[in-house]
């Protein structure tokens, strides 16, 4: 398996874990001191503890549309030794039939033979979504 294939599989595993509610599985793919620019918050999240806090702050309105599908596509992956840069588009489908298009950039590092995300930046695309 190429590094690019392995990294892309891990990116997709994060989304699968999100849909399954498996935060431990997601966190296992993140470096302990990961940094995250979340689309819903302005501040930079630093580390798994603050990430867990961010998750708890997310609204839990049972009447709000829920995420039903995450379609990661169009990956552009560059690898330089033990560092990789991943850019992709994420289509988020909600239970009310609406969609959001998210642009995502993440940085990955290989440590002890495993690729872990060290930074993630997501941005809800404006201007009508996909061109």
Sequence positions of predicted segments:
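A solvent-exposed, acidic/Ser-Thr-rich amphipathic alpha-helical stretch
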Residues: 4-5, 23-79
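Short, well-ordered beta-strand segments in beta-rich or mixed alpha/beta enzyme
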Residues: 35-39, 84-92
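Hydrophobic/aromatic beta-strand elements that line small-molecule binding cavities or substrate pockets
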Residues: 55, 72-77, 89-92, 103-109, ...
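Residue-level preference for beta-strand/loop junctions
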Residues: 69, 82, 86, 100-102
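Short beta-strand edge/turn micro-motifs at domain boundaries
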Residues: 101-131
């Amino acid at each position: 398996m190429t590094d690019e294939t392995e990294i892309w599989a891990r990116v997709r595993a994060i989304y699968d874990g999100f849909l399954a509610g498996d935060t431990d599985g997601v966190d296992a793919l993140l470096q302990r001191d990961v940094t995250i620019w979340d689309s819903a918050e302005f501040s930079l999240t630093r580390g798994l503890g603050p990430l867990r806090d961010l998750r708890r702050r997310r609204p839990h309105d049972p009447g709000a549309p829920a995420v039903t599908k995450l379609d990661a596509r169009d990956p552009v992956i560059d690898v330089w030794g033990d560092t990789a840069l991943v850019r992709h588009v994420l289509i988020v489908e909600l239970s009310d039939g609406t969609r959001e298009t998210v642009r995502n950039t993440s940085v990955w590092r290989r440590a002890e033979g495993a690729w872990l995300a060290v930074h993630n930046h997501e941005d809800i695309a404006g201007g009508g979504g996909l061109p």
